[in-house]
Each structure stands twice: as structure tokens, then as C-alpha cells.
Design a protein with these regions (language model features):
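Functional-site microenvironments in short loops/helix caps that host divalent-cation chemistry
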Residues: 1-126, 141
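Short, structured beta-strand segments at or near domain termini in extracellular proteins/domains
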Residues: 126-140
Length: 142
């Protein structure tokens, strides 16, 4: 089973991404990838949320293997629910690193594309994971 990695603090998530020559996305990159061009509250629009993510109502209080729900229009899976995801962004107002996406233990509202929470980077949670991002070199137009 390919369940999401969880229970890593922000530093451990950063180190893992660095080792594979990637990085944590910023919260804005994360939201852009999650929305996949949508402007609605949820990236799936008016479709049944149970087709798109694991949350309190359908998760049976646990994570699930990745990729079982429908992807967004960019083809990215699990951008809502299953586990919250660390980002590389920091909010001075809360003193914490930004976490996005909602998890299996939250209501559907946590899966809104714009929803965020924060945590101190030293904390580990059984409902927070991460995904790595890769910087793509820009191509100069000549």
C-alpha cells in the first residue's frame, strides 16, 4: 500500500525533499497546483467531494493509499484530504509554517483550496504529511 508519509516535522520533510533534489512548495504554489485552473471553493467544483478526497465522513479515521480518488484537472491526486501537507511558507501572524489541504480527520471545509493552518515546524502529527516540488528552469525566449 502506498499511503502518504506522515508524522514528519517540517525539518524532516524539507530534508527528504532536499535529498531527492526537490523542495517543499510555497503555499501559493501548492494552491495553484491544487486549484488546477479552478476558481471555485473546492477544486472539483460541484462534484461529489467523496470522489475527490478522504475526510471525516468517508475516511474511517485513517489515511488511505494515494491515488484512489479522482485527480484534479492537472492530473494531481490527493490535493484535498487524506493528510494536510507542509509548505515552505511561514506566517508571521501565527509564527508557524503553513499547512494546506485538509486531512482524513477534518470536515469537508478543510479541503477548500484556499484553506490553511499553521504549526511550529518542530511538531509531528499523524494527519500531516508533505509532497515535494521541483523547480523547472525557465526557457529564455530569444
Amino acid at each position: 500500500e502506498q499511503r502518504p508519509v506522515e508524522k514528519l516535522n517540517w525539518f524532516e520533510a524539507m530534508e527528504y525533499c532536499r535529498r531527492i533534489k526537490k523542495r517543499l512548495p510555497t503555499e501559493w504554489e501548492w494552491e495553484w497546483a491544487a486549484r488546477a485552473g479552478s476558481v471555485s471553493k473546492f477544486y472539483w467544483g460541484e462534484e461529489d467531494p467523496e470522489l475527490h478526497g478522504w475526510f471525516k465522513k468517508n475516511s474511517e479515521k485513517k489515511t488511505h493509499p494515494v491515488g484512489l480518488k479522482l485527480p484534479n484537472s492537472f492530473g494531481i491526486y490527493d490535493m484535498g484530504g487524506n493528510v494536510w501537507e507542509w509548505t515552505n511558507s511561514y506566517r508571521e501572524t501565527t509564527g508557524g509554517k503553513v499547512i494546506r489541504g485538509g486531512s482524513w480527520r477534518n470536515s469537508i471545509n478543510a479541503m477548500q483550496s484556499s484553506k490553511w493552518i499553521t504549526s511550529l515546524p518542530i511538531h509531528r502529527f499523524h494527519y500531516v504529511g508533505f509532497r515535494c516540488a521541483k523547480t523547472v528552469p525557465s526557457v529564455a525566449n530569444n
